[in-house]
């Protein structure tokens, strides 16, 4: 891309400063006129059109079938047979592959048990992973690319015995999710304005989570958009 940009002459070049590094900027020839503005496709992608929304629902139905089968399998096997984090991720991938129109994962699956589940963007490998034990939380953060769109879903299940403190934290997070999911907000409201709905139950007890509440998802493209 650097050579391609360097070859542009006597043109008007749209530049989004927050998305272009300095090295690429320096490749723009002085004969060009630079216009600093947001990429016009960003706003178009930020709001899904009716066709995209309809197809995303179809993608999530397929993904939901795969995830439901996986969670059923996990509840039958986790804590009862020897099971490792990567094995669980592979099983989920098999369920997704069985869905018509599945193209592949939308990102590397986060399959984490116990303390690993508290690590943002943890990645288990065959060389470094943990067994899915008998007492604790198992978290799976995963998604798929389908012809109908892109998914990104996180679920947490209890394996074996969990403490009262763990139950409380789980319940508070669930309360926040339900509050945000069922909220009615006005046109023009930003994500920042409704963030408290998700964090409120935790804040009221003096807790918080050191992570974003959510993010945009592309349409058969980048899962973080």
Residue ranges of model-derived segments:
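Active-site neighborhoods and metal-handling regions in enzymes and metal-associated proteins
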Residues: 1-225
């Amino acid at each position: 891309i650097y050579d391609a940009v360097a070859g542009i002459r006597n043109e008007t070049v749209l530049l989004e400063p927050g998305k272009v590094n300095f090295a690429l900027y320096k490749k723009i020839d002085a004969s060009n006129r630079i216009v600093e503005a947001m990429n016009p496709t960003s706003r178009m992608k930020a709001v899904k059109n009716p066709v995209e929304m309809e197809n995303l629902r179809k993608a999530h139905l397929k993904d939901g079938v795969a995830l439901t089968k996986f969670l059923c399998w996990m509840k039958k096997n986790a804590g009862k047979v020897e099971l490792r984090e990567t094995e669980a991720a592979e099983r989920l991938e098999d369920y997704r592959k069985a869905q018509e129109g599945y193209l592949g994962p939308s990102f590397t699956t986060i399959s984490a048990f116990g303390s690993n589940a508290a690590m943002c963007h943890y990645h288990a490998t065959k060389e470094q992973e943990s067994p899915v034990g008998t007492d604790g939380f198992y978290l799976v953060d995963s998604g798929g690319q389908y012809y109908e769109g892109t998914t990104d879903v996180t679920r947490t299940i209890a394996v074996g015995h969990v403490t009262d403190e763990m139950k409380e934290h789980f319940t508070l997070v669930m309360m926040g999710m339900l509050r945000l999911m069922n909220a009615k907000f006005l046109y023009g409201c930003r994500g920042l304005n409704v963030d408290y709905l998700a964090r409120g139950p935790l804040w009221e007890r003096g807790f918080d989570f050191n992570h974003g509440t959510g993010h945009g998802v592309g349409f058969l493209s980048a899962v973080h958009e």
